[in-house]
Curated annotation (Swiss-Prot):
Ligand binding (Mg(2+)): F325, R326, C328, T352
An example Gene Ontology biological process: mycothiol biosynthetic process
SUPFAM superfamilies assigned to the protein according to its UniProt record, in alphabetical order: UDP-Glycosyltransferase/glycogen phosphorylase
Residues annotated as binding 1D-myo-inositol 3-phosphate: H30, D41, A42, G43, G44, M45, N46, K99, Y132, T156, R176
Known partners and oligomeric status: Homodimer.
Keywords linked to the UniProt accession: Glycosyltransferase, Magnesium, Metal-binding, Transferase
Official protein name in the record: D-inositol 3-phosphate glycosyltransferase
Similarity-based family: Belongs to the glycosyltransferase group 1 family. MshA subfamily.
Function: Catalyzes the transfer of a N-acetyl-glucosamine moiety to 1D-myo-inositol 3-phosphate to produce 1D-myo-inositol 2-acetamido-2-deoxy-glucopyranoside 3-phosphate in the mycothiol biosynthesis pathway.
Length: 443
């Protein structure tokens, strides 16, 4: 394992020159960007792909997204908005395949991507941008076939996940580690959300620092905005005077919603006067190991004697999710690891402070002491104490709420798209100056 000098990393994460292509192929094999985040395999990556595609299209760049078909009702292709096409590529049965089974369908999926491009005039795509390692494997071959640069965004990394496993979680397989190492080595450019993710790619995956660009994600300012807290609570059936904590995400061990449930139970024991007013709102659906027992979090709340204080809501789209954030006094993000933690940013854009685990990208998404609090570890008592200090101190919450708005305003999808255009343009120029050899010629 090689650690790059800090000067090399600083050059690698410098802002890119703003140039770009005419048409971009994006690959999101395992999940469609049109799926509802918060359940199954849909999450922040889905939001990232769709939002960046929209902003690129606004800048006159055509974006075509390739994802695996999961239903016979899906058309071969559709256009969710002007300048964007989503292709549903048949690869294996529509049902019965988990994300862990999808490596067996890489050949079929890649073939579908290549066939779609072959029906177009030569030089149809200028760049291919893959999201997640499975997509990276498919895009690697497509980029070589088309003679275009391959830009890769990992979103999550096996080596990092395995370093931060929840007790009930399953380690990522060695095959994924190998696949990620290959994609990192063969990509023309690597886009990361934070400088810490860039360092991980260099330190753990031996990425070339000169290929790494930091491009933070954004938040939609037309959706996630401050609003009437009392009106939001009444629409959700929450008491006006409640102290409301929120969680939004997939219900799985990695996201650690159980930490919040246990912390609420502990807080009620530490401060009995708060018990009648405390509420926890959980937005999300089962995923990963959590899908084996979809009601495990309900069962935990009942076991701890706080079922009456926890409201479970199904995953919901942007405007409805924003309303939940507005209803909350504090939003918790206790994940064992996050490449960024988009939910934290969206909550802050609604003027709600965030208490988050001090891991991964959450240390960038949350400004500790300014827009929220970062907690080291996942001990329920530590979380209960931190929450107690916030819910019982309205002036401090108000200061953090103002800081949350200030911090979130620094992250926009427009900035993300501009940075991506720069990364694409630089990769196009590098390949034009020094065309890459095929993998076969390297051996």
């Amino acid at each position: 394992m090689r650690t790059a000098p800090r000067s090399q990393l600083n050059r690698a994460i410098a802002p890119c020159r703003k140039r770009g292509p005419r048409r971009v192929a994006m690959v999101s094999m395992h999940t469609s960007p049109l799926e509802q985040p918060g359940t199954g395999d849909a999450g922040g990556m889905n939001v990232y792909v769709l939002q960046t595609a929209r902003r690129l299209a606004d800048r006159g760049v055509a974006v075509e997204i390739f994802t695996r078909a999961t239903s016979s009702e899906q058309p071969p292709a559709l256009s969710p908005s002007e300048g964007i096409t989503v292709h549903y590529v048949p690869a294996g049965p529509f049902e019965g395949l988990s994300k862990g089974d999808l490596p067996s369908q890489l050949c079929a999926f890649t073939n579908g991507v290549l066939r779609a491009e072959a029906a177009q005039p030569p030089g149809y795509f200028d760049v291919i941008h893959s999201h997640y390692w499975l997509s990276g494997q498919a895009a690697w071959l497509a980029a070589e076939r088309w003679g275009v640069p391959h830009i890769h965004s990992a979103h999550t990394l096996a080596k990092v996940k395995n370093l931060h496993l929840a007790a009930e979680d399953t380690p990522e397989p060695f095959t994924r580690v190998v696949g990620e190492e290959q994609v990192v080595a063969e990509s023309d450019a690597l886009v990361t959300n934070t400088s810490s993710e860039a360092e991980v790619l260099v330190d753990l995956y031996r990425a070339d620092p000169d290929k790494v660009t930091v491009t933070p994600p954004g938040v939609d300012p037309e959706v996630f905005t401050p609003g009437d807290k009392l009106a939001a609570r009444r629409r959700l059936g929450l008491p006006d005077d409640a102290l409301v904590l929120g969680f939004a995400g997939r219900i799985q061990p990695l996201k650690a919603p159980d930490v919040l449930v246990r912390a609420v139970a502990r807080l009620r024991a530490l401060n009995p006067e708060l018990a009648p007013r405390l509420r926890l709102v959980v937005v999300g659906g089962p995923s990963g190991n959590g899908a084996d027992n979809p009601r495990w979090l309900h069962d935990l709340a009942a076991e701890l004697g706080i079922a009456d204080a926890v409201t479970f809501l199904k995953p919901r789209a942007g405007h409805e999710l924003a309303e939940v954030f507005r209803a909350c006094d504090v939003v918790g993000v206790p994940s064992y690891n996050e490449t960024f933690g988009l939910v934290a940013l969206e909550a802050q854009a609604c003027g709600t402070p965030v208490v988050a685990a001090a891991v991964g990208g959450l240390t960038t998404a949350v400004a500790d002491g300014h827009s929220g609090l970062l907690i080291r570890g996942h001990d329920e008592t530590d979380w209960a104490n931190a929450l107690d200090k916030l819910v019982t101190d309205a002036p401090r919450r108000a200061r953090l709420a103002a800081g949350a708005l200030d911090h979130a305003a620094r992250f926009t999808w427009s900035h993300t798209a501009d940075d991506l255009l720069g990364a694409y343009g630089d990769a196009i120029q590098r390949r034009a100056v020094s065309p890459r050899r095929s993998p076969a010629s390297k051996r």
